[in-house]
């Protein structure tokens, strides 16, 4: 496996989102190394995207989204689930890609269909917020033998409040993969 370099993340968010599909999310938490293949993501395009956390501006919570690229943005939802995002583009944009689902590859026994479930299975929590994804214990890597697949584009899940942004085709997943989240 080859860790993704910083310039990978510094590009257009939609391009990064699509190219994250098939990559490996790796977390070594001191107990064991867990690896999951990214099979579903959502793109959040910065301050003009009403579904994006950064649309409310720079806050203590969203500061990491404004850069630099290649850092993890991890936050708690419903008081019980962590969601993991990858910060993208140049500093100041406030864009990120939400990792929605993983296919278990190594040391994952729990369900990974959905952002909260995958974070629980991978032991991702608030301690990993603002973590550099070029670190040695938490990163995304190119698999040794990439596979071909078809990418499906759909509207993001759970963003009905975002007006015209609710129907944008910014959710991407690997066609026919059994590990995508349920809608």
UniProtKB/Swiss-Prot annotation:
Keyword Hydrolase: yes
GO molecular function annotation: alkylbase DNA N-glycosylase activity; DNA binding
UniProt record, GO biological process: base-excision repair
Assigned keywords, A-Z: DNA damage, DNA repair, Hydrolase
Protein origin, superkingdom: Bacteria
Enzyme Commission number, as recorded: 3.2.2.-
PANTHER family: DNA-3-METHYLADENINE GLYCOSYLASE (PTHR10429:SF0)
Family: Belongs to the DNA glycosylase MPG family.
Matching HAMAP family: 3MGH
Protein name, entry field: Putative 3-methyladenine DNA glycosylase
Originating species: Legionella pneumophila (strain Corby)
Lineage summary: Bacteria, Pseudomonadati, Pseudomonadota, Gammaproteobacteria, Legionellales
């Amino acid at each position: 496996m080859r860790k993704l370099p910083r310039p990978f993340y510094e590009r257009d968010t939609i391009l990064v989102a699509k190219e994250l599909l098939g990559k490996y999310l790796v977390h070594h938490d001191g107990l064991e190394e867990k690896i999951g293949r990214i099979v579903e993501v959502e793109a959040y395009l910065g301050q003009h995207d009403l579904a994006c956390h950064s649309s409310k501006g720079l806050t203590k919570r969203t500061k990491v989204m404004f850069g630099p690229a290649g850092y993890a943005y991890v936050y708690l939802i419903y008081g019980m689930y962590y969601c993991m995002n990858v910060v993208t583009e140049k500093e100041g944009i406030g864009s990120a890609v939400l990792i929605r689902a993983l296919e278990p590859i190594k040391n994952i026994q729990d369900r990974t269909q959905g952002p909260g479930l995958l974070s629980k299975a991978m032991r991702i929590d608030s301690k990993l917020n603002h973590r550099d994804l070029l670190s040695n214990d938490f990163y995304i890597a190119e698999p040794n033998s990439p596979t071909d697949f078809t990418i499906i584009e759909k509207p993001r899940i759970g963003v009905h409040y975002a007006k015209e942004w609710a129907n944008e085709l910014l959710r991407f997943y690997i066609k026919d993969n059994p590990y995508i989240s349920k809608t």
